[in-house]
């Protein structure tokens, strides 16, 4: 009975997942989770360093197509969506995972740093969601999952562009959901807490800051990328068909303190 329930509500068999930034950190964890759940994958990466991720997917007997693109380029975004449909015929799940961060005090922040972060973290999310939602509307269904942050709720320090972009991601998640829910397209977001990735390595290396973070997390540990696997499958599967515009914090309790 449990196996039937799991298959009915959480299986992604025969689903096509389009994932950006899927060859490292949390993106790689999402990709592996999708492969475990039976989805076929179209993975957009900034570089061609995807051999390790490819092996992880193949270990799950999954099918993955890797596509290199610069997500600051509107035309390359458009072409990536066209290529996915050309290969698979459809897109059932979009995960806007690709992101970047630039750290510097506000008074020293450079214009190009601001633009770089907003282009990847916000503009690419908008363009991809717009392009893919048109396909999902024709299909009659779809899931769009954005990646928010604890800094979708807080101000942060020394990361003004990142904070602005992640507040905006939370906002457009709700805005998109308002328009797309009636088309059977669910738009939601995951807000990861403090996760062990390359982006957070400088913080973890700062003994004082690391202790401050751990002292605030009720779970008393940094998340591992695999801690996010369950949430991404939930939002990508039938189990979340009546969930719209929600920002799901997976944070070990960070926000409740």
Predicted regions and their residues:
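Short C-terminal tail/terminal secondary-structure segment
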Residues: 2-8, 154, 233, 244-257
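Conserved glycine-rich cofactor-binding loop
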Residues: 16, 23-24
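Substrate-binding pocket helix/loop in short-chain dehydrogenase/reductase
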Residues: 105-106, 113-118, 213
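Active-site loop-to-helix junction immediately N-terminal to the catalytic Tyr of the SDR YXXXK motif
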Residues: 109, 155-163, 175, 200
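Active-site helix of classical SDR
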Residues: 129, 165, 173
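Residue(s) in the substrate-gating loop at a strand-loop-helix junction
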Residues: 149
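Short, small/polar-rich loop/turn modules that mediate ligand/substrate recognition or access, typified
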Residues: 181, 186, 243-245
């Amino acid at each position: 009975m449990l196996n039937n329930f799991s298959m009915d509500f959480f299986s992604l068999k025969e689903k096509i997942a389009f994932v950006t930034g899927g060859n490292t950190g949390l993106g790689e964890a999402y990709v592996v989770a999708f492969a475990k759940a039976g989805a076929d994958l179209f993975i957009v990466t900034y570089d061609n360093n995807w051999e390790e991720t490819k092996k992880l997917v193949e270990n799950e007997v999954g099918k993955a197509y890797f596509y290199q693109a610069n997500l600051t380029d509107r035309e390359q975004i458009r072409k990536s969506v066209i290529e996915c449909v050309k290969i698979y015929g459809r897109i059932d799940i979009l995960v806007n995972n690709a992101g970047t961060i630039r750290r510097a005090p506000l008074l020293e922040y450079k214009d190009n740093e601001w633009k770089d972060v907003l282009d990847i973290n916000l503009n690419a999310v908008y363009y991809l969601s717009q392009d893919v939602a048109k396909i999902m509307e024709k299909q009659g269904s779809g899931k769009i999952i954005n990646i928010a942050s604890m800094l979708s709720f807080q101000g942060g320090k020394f990361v003004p562009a990142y904070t602005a972009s992640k507040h905006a991601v939370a906002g457009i998640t709700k805005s998109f959901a308002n328009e797309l829910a009636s088309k059977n397209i669910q738009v939601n977001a995951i807000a990861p807490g403090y996760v062990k990735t390359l982006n957070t390595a400088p913080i973890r290396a700062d003994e004082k800051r690391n202790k401050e973070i751990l002292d605030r997390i009720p779970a008393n540990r940094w998340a591992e990328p695999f801690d996010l696997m369950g949430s991404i499958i939930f939002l990508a599967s039938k189990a979340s068909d009546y969930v719209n515009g929600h920002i799901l914090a997976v944070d070990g309790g960070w926000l409740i303190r």
